[in-house]
Amino acid sequence: MAMRQTPLTCSGHTRPVVDLAFSGITPYGYFLISACKDGKPMLRQGDTGDWIGTFLGHKGAVWGATLNKDATKAATAAADFTAKVWDAVSGDELMTLAHKHIVKTVDFTQDSNYLLTGGQDKLLRIYDLNKPEAEPKEISGHTSGIKKALWCSEDKQILSADDKTVRLWDHATMTEVKSLNFNMSVSSMEYIPEGEILVITYGRSIAFHSAVSLDPIKSFEAPATINSASLHPEKEFVVAGGEDFKLYKYDYNSGEELESYKGHFGPIHCVRFSPDGELYASGSEDGTLRLWQTVVGKTYGLWKCVLPEEDSGELAKPKINFPETAEEELEEIASENSDSIYSSTPEVKA
């Protein structure tokens, strides 16, 4: 029988998980940060989901979170009208950046010297993190609250999305280069540096555009409203999740749906591939993060594939090296998504 998905579940949040981001690969592996309406962003080991720490200091829902490339700094965007920068090693708050309204999105430059923010006041702000007392540079032009803002093209350009528009800006001149208009709300945006690809979701559509010109490349239609999508680092697969609680996996080249399965017990708000492409993470209204294998049955992280000769001649089956727990909801997902037997119900406790 074909093996299918059973995820690792990362518990600890008490409200919906609305954003997540991976660091780059460091000498210590890679890391995962999550933003949650409980106001307590969390840092985890990326390949296992093991909880490392919680960043304490926000006084409202945290809408956006990111890590710099080497996972030494974190940044968060919150409903308390602030963005914060943190030491991701010690957990200490390094600076608080006051805004005039709710902040929704944050992104570091590649050298971690500048932070880009956006939110409900419709302004993009660029902070020089080496001069925390200096006023930020501001870019105006959006006509509604900014949902996502990202550096692109080696930090020479900026991509930003509001309700129904995606805009491309020149960093040096602070002027708009081009914009894309949609007939419905843009739900998410992801930038892939290799190949300069922009992934945009709106309605049931997953669209791919050139990040340099905003010209269309291709698009897929999903069976349900999609809130987030992510492109595999080697551009093999696309994963997406949305309002029907399901995760969808597509072949990027052909657009063929390869898998679909129940992923959570609430709408899925965010999906991202790990930097090595071995797994992807999803965050949901149900308050959990879940980690999924890109190739099921492969030995990786907490997953271990038992070969036939190691298992009394039976078919190979994935096992998870993790203490046994009793979580009924994961058993339900396992029964729906798997034709194989797993050694335990995985759970990461924060």
UniProtKB/Swiss-Prot annotation:
Residues 327-350 are annotated as: Disordered. PROSITE patterns: WD_REPEATS_1 (PS00678), WD_REPEATS_2 (PS50082), WD_REPEATS_REGION (PS50294). GO terms for biological process: alternative mRNA splicing, via spliceosome; maintenance of gastrointestinal epithelium; negative regulation of transcription by RNA polymerase II; negative regulation of transforming growth factor beta receptor signaling pathway; neuron differentiation; spliceosomal snRNP assembly. It is found in: Cytoplasm; Nucleus. The modification Phosphoserine is found at residues 312, 335, 338. Its main location: cytoplasm. GO terms for molecular function: mRNA binding; RNA binding; signaling receptor binding; U2 snRNP binding. WD repeats lie at residues 12-56, 57-96, 98-137, 141-179, 180-212, 221-262, 263-302. Residues 337-350 have a biased composition (Polar residues). Keywords: Cytoplasm, mRNA processing, mRNA splicing, Nucleus, Phosphoprotein, Repeat, WD repeat. The modification Phosphotyrosine is found at residue 342. Belongs to the WD repeat STRAP family. Part of the core SMN complex that contains SMN1, GEMIN2/SIP1, DDX20/GEMIN3, GEMIN4, GEMIN5, GEMIN6, GEMIN7, GEMIN8 and STRAP/UNRIP. Part of the SMN-Sm complex that contains SMN1, GEMIN2/SIP1, DDX20/GEMIN3, GEMIN4, GEMIN5, GEMIN6, GEMIN7, GEMIN8, STRAP/UNRIP and the Sm proteins SNRPB, SNRPD1, SNRPD2, SNRPD3, SNRPE, SNRPF and SNRPG. Interacts directly with GEMIN6 and GEMIN7. Associates with the SMN complex in the cytoplasm but not in the nucleus. Also interacts with CSDE1/UNR and MAWBP. Interacts with PDPK1. Interacts with TRIM48. The SMN complex catalyzes the assembly of small nuclear ribonucleoproteins (snRNPs), the building blocks of the spliceosome, and thereby plays an important role in the splicing of cellular pre-mRNAs. Most spliceosomal snRNPs contain a common set of Sm proteins SNRPB, SNRPD1, SNRPD2, SNRPD3, SNRPE, SNRPF and SNRPG that assemble in a heptameric protein ring on the Sm site of the small nuclear RNA to form the core snRNP (Sm core). This is Serine-threonine kinase receptor-associated protein.
